């Protein structure tokens, strides 16, 4: 298994680990999203001083406004964070 295939598998497993806790097992509720962010992206969450960060992320991700985040909506968050991390990495390499 390549590194990229392994990363994709990890994304899928992480999503379903959290999405299967309550309600629709293929979507993240607000509580499941918060749990995922705290468990998997705690450094990112801690860096934000905004107490409404989870609500804002949920609102931004929930494109169809159903109050839940499906896998496709979740991957948008991961992609955006990855782009931001890459930009930071490139800047740090320049210095």
Swiss-Prot record:
Dimer of either two alpha chains, or two beta chains, or one alpha and one beta chain. Also forms heterodimers with S100P. Interacts with AGER. Interacts with CAPZA1. Interacts with FKBP4. Interacts with RYR1 and RYR2. Interacts with CACYBP in a calcium-dependent manner. Interacts with PPP5C (via TPR repeats); the interaction is calcium-dependent and modulates PPP5C activity. Interacts with ATP2A2 and PLN in a Ca(2+)-dependent manner. Interacts with mitochondrial F1-ATPase subunits ATP5F1A and ATP5F1B; these interactions increase F1-ATPase activity. Ca(2+) 2 binds at residues 62, 64, 66, 68, 73. This is Protein S100-A1. GO terms for cellular component: mitochondrion; sarcoplasmic reticulum. One of its GO terms (molecular function) is calcium ion binding. Its main location: cytoplasm. Disulfide bonds: none annotated. Ca(2+) 1 binds at residues 27, 32. It comes from Misgurnus fossilis (Weatherfish). InterPro entries: EF-hand-dom_pair, EF_Hand_1_Ca_BS, EF_hand_dom, S100/CaBP7/8-like_CS, S100_Ca-bd_sub. Keywords: Calcium, Cytoplasm, Metal-binding, Mitochondrion, Repeat, Sarcoplasmic reticulum, Zinc.
